[in-house]
């Protein structure tokens, strides 16, 4: 089991190309409630975004076929994070949106159509 975990971590580290800074790890470990709250919000937003794509582009059958199970999966992740938070006595509450996502969304084209969809999908992949 440990060999497999080491192998999985090595695969992940190879993919990321850079080591996570120790300061970030220490900050995250010292702020688990905030980390979990942020994670819950990210899962909720991912589910909502997938549902919004289904609503906005119902004529794109392939997109709908991909987004429906994605929305379901992200909502399940949301529920799992909420359960972990409850076990730890952490209350799900509002969280100030990050500037990172807001700044990315400023670059989405104002045109409707495929260009806007592509911009939104690229930003979703980045986030």
Give the label of every model feature segment.
Residues 1-127:
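Non-heme di-metal
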């Amino acid at each position: 089991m440990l060999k497999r975990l080491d192998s999985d971590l090595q695969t992940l580290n190879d993919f990321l190309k850079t080591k996570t800074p120790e300061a970030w790890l220490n900050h995250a470990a010292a702020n688990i409630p905030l980390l979990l709250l942020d994670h819950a919000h990210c899962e909720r937003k991912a589910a909502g975004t997938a549902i919004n794509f289904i609503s906005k582009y119902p004529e794109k059958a392939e997109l709908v076929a991909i987004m429906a199970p994605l929305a379901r999966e992200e909502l399940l992740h949301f529920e799992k994070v909420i359960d972990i938070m409850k076990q730890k006595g952490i209350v799900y509450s509002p969280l100030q949106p990050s500037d990172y996502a807001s700044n990315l969304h400023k670059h989405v084209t104002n045109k409707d159509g495929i260009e806007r969809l592509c911009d939104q999908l690229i930003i979703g992949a980045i986030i």
